[in-house]
Every structure is written in structure tokens, then in C-alpha cells.
Amino acid sequence: MPGLLSAMEGFCVIGIVIATGYVAARMRIGGPSAQMALNRFSFFVSSPCLMFAILSKEKIFEIFHSSIVVAFFSAVLVGVVFLILNRLFFHMKAADATIGALNSLYLNSNNIGLPIATYILGNPALVAPILVMQQAVFTPIGLTVLDVTTKGKVSAKEILKQPLHQPLLIGSLLGIAVSAISAKVGFFVIPSCIYDPINMIGNSAVPMILMAFGMSLHGPKPLQDKSNVPAVFTVAALKNIVMPIIAFLLSYFVMGFRGATLYACVVLAALPTGQNVYNYAARYNVGLSFARDGILFSTLSSPIFIAIIAVLLG
């Protein structure tokens, strides 16, 4: 049971920080804009610094591990499953169905993924390939479909510019570049007087992210749109149950992973839906409550299934 114990200790750490954020919001500490300030600072400053600091010192061949194949195909398959279910049962319009597919496959590699990778899996660099994959592949595809279905046209310029609006992706790519250069020349090329402050700022990312998430729980009640209830629970089940099962099958039978690698693949597949999905829904003003509720319920149920995974595989 060491895997379960490690997972529970990790969730205890994460839960206490989230609860601190929730209490701070209830007591109105920091004022009404505190959550936004924490979110924006962590998104634009702390998290990119963290990813740069981690990846720049990670061996280049360990960053792009073959486990990315599992993450990619498990996400694609679960997205296809939602689209099939929508065609058979929900009959949502194309734009709403796109939000549903993203709700089902898009991992919260930052707000929840970084803390879980840090405190449960012991290696925050594990989320980097997933982050790059989502921002470079799934985000452009999703935004292209939303452009077509809501505007009737594709803005190629906006799609191509999207990665430039993602500080996490930029920080990750810069870290990967430094790792590659360091491997080439045989020593770490960033002097400590530059690396140390970047690393120091990056260390603030996880607590800020978790407290901001805790603050977000003090807000409007979920499931106000009753027509979305079946779809909301469906995307939560797809995200937290079906996707980890697919990841296990691919990891074990196709890729031949065992031990810590198998465990990490399945745990990361059980991460809740990324909050980016709500940002995309808000940008196109489509499926807002659906996106928010899907994220909330996948986030609330994710620890349960990660604990089960820890019992079975940890």
C-alpha cells in the first residue's frame, strides 16, 4: 500500500493549500480580485519559470519519453467516444460538442497536474510533454473547429498565434532548448545568478495555483442548467474513469510499460479537465456552464480515482 499512502499524503498537502484558498475567499482576504491576481501571476510568471527551471536541468531524452504516445492516443480515443455518445444521445450542436470533447480529453496539466506530479509522482517534469502536446495539437484543432462552427470561417492567423499566448508552453520550450544545448556542450549553460531567481520564482507556482483554485470554489452553485446534467456526468466519467482505463491498456499491452512508468501514465490520465476549456468556451461564448460544471465534477472526482489507481498500481 505504499502507493496509496504516498497518494494520500500528496492529496493531504494539496487539500490543505486548496482549503486555505477557500477560507481566504470566504473571509474576503485580498479582496474580490485576489483569485484573479493569483491566477494571472501563476499563469504568466511563476508557472513558466517553474517549467523552465525543471526542464532546463532535465535530460533531453527523458523529457520526450515514449509515454507521450499513451497520453496522445488515450486523449484522442476518449474524445471520439464523447462525439459518438453525443451523436447517439445528447444531440448537441457542433460547437457545444467540441467543448464536450475537450472536457473529456483535456488534462489539467498545470493547476492540478503540477502538484500531483510533484507530490504524488515525485517528478513535476512528467507533465511537460503533455502540456506541449495539448498546446501544440489539441488547442489549435479545438479552436479551429470553434472558429468554423461559431463564425463560419477559420482565422488561420489567430490559430497560429495561439501558442504565443501560452506562457507555460513558451517556458517549457525554452527549458527544453536549454536542456538540448547543455547536452550538446556537456555542461549547464545558464549561470546560477540567472537560474536561481528563476527557480525561486517558479517555486511559488504550485501554492499560488492551489490557493487560486480553492478561491474559485467559493462561487456560483453548479448544475444550474439542468439540460446539461447527463452530459456533465458523462464527460466526468470519460475523463476520470474511461481515459485511465484506456491509458492502462495502451501502457501495459501496447507499450509494455511496467512499474513506475505504468503508474505515472495512468495517474496522469486520471487528472481532471483543464481549466483552459472554460477559457475557450468563454472566448467563443458557447457551452459556458457545461464547461464549468464538467471541470468542477471531474476535479472533485479525480482524487477518488487516483487513490484507486494508487491501490492497484502504486
Predicted regions and their residues:
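Alpha-helical transmembrane segments of multi-pass small-molecule/ion transporters
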Residues: M1-G314
